[in-house]
Amino acid sequence: MQLLDGKALSAKIETTVAKEVKELKNSTNLVPGLAVILVGQDPASAAYVNMKKKACDRVGFYSVTHEMPSDISQSAIENTITMMNNNPNIDGILIQLPLPTQIDTTKILELVEPSKDVDGFHPYNVGRLTTGLDGFVPCTPLGVMELLKEYKIDVKGKNCVVVGASNIVGKPMAALLLNANATVEICHIFTDDLKKHTLAADMIFVGAGVINLIKEDMVKGGAIIVDIGINRAESGKLVGDVDFENVAKKCSFITPVPGGVGPMTIAMLLSNTLKAAKAHAKENE
């Protein structure tokens, strides 16, 4: 069994991004800018935003966080997004999800200018992904693909099972795998007999938010396991959706939690923001 080390790869990517930021600044005098909108006091969301800010600082991005109270109105968030859309110093806009229940999340995501949609959640970018065109891809599944590439794991022709059908992870993960010529199956909360599906899989990508959902008897020998889940166990420890200790014995590759997919998500946010900055710089030449 070999670990898919997202922490090590993300550090490599950060070094490359930092170098390219310097080059961009030297040639155009522009610095990539990321705006984050954080609504409410959710500790997990605040921790994620803080990690993103630190990563921006490490690579030399300009970043700003708009913190808003949980009882904020729809129009107040919309006004902030419009302001960021029109701000030439901002290349990427990130809406930290989930948003409070009174907010129409779909409308908010649709308001973000697609060329600044570094999370890849705008329907325009979702459409480009599903039709195999270049655009912004959600950071977590994009990070998974980069991690597989680093370890020279080719998904072409492989039976891939994606567990979880969210717009943020499951659906874009399936689209990326399909674009790379994998045979893809998506399982979700209504799937009957999950074990039957996972046992037939060469590769399992799980992002369902359920501790120990994937157990040893659900995985065939030599399978590749990508654990996208991140949960807080009763002990306070961060764990994924896979029973790591027991499943690791059976598989050929597996991502640890933490240190697997998580760091790659942030690395791809940096990569997407740099991509946006370069595109904006080209437009202004």
From Swiss-Prot:
The keyword Oxidoreductase applies. The keyword Oxidoreductase applies. It catalyses: (6R)-5,10-methylene-5,6,7,8-tetrahydrofolate + NADP(+) = (6R)-5,10-methenyltetrahydrofolate + NADPH; (6R)-5,10-methenyltetrahydrofolate + H2O = (6R)-10-formyltetrahydrofolate + H(+). It comes from the Bacteria. GO terms for biological process: L-histidine biosynthetic process; methionine biosynthetic process; purine nucleotide biosynthetic process; tetrahydrofolate interconversion. Its EC number is 1.5.1.5, 3.5.4.9. PROSITE patterns: THF_DHG_CYH_2 (PS00767). CDD domains: NAD_bind_m-THF_DH_Cyclohyd. One of its GO terms (molecular function) is methylenetetrahydrofolate dehydrogenase (NADP+) activity. Keywords: Amino-acid biosynthesis, Histidine biosynthesis, Hydrolase, Methionine biosynthesis, Multifunctional enzyme, NADP, One-carbon metabolism, Oxidoreductase, Purine biosynthesis. GO terms for cellular component: cytosol. Pfam families: THF_DHG_CYH, THF_DHG_CYH_C. InterPro entries: Aminoacid_DH-like_N_sf, NAD(P)-bd_dom_sf, THF_DH/CycHdrlase, THF_DH/CycHdrlase_cat_dom, THF_DH/CycHdrlase_CS, THF_DH/CycHdrlase_NAD-bd_dom. Transmembrane segments: none annotated. Gene3D superfamilies: Leucine Dehydrogenase, chain A, domain 1 (3.40.50.10860), NAD(P)-binding Rossmann-like Domain (3.40.50.720). Pathway: One-carbon metabolism; tetrahydrofolate interconversion. Catalyzes the oxidation of 5,10-methylenetetrahydrofolate to 5,10-methenyltetrahydrofolate and then the hydrolysis of 5,10-methenyltetrahydrofolate to 10-formyltetrahydrofolate. NCBIfam families: PRK10792.1 (NF008058), PRK14183.1 (NF010780), PRK14186.1 (NF010783), PRK14191.1 (NF010787). Belongs to the tetrahydrofolate dehydrogenase/cyclohydrolase family. PANTHER family: C-1-TETRAHYDROFOLATE SYNTHASE, CYTOPLASMIC (PTHR48099:SF5), C-1-TETRAHYDROFOLATE SYNTHASE, CYTOPLASMIC-RELATED (PTHR48099). Homodimer. This is Bifunctional protein FolD. It comes from Sulfurimonas denitrificans (strain ATCC 33889 / DSM 1251).
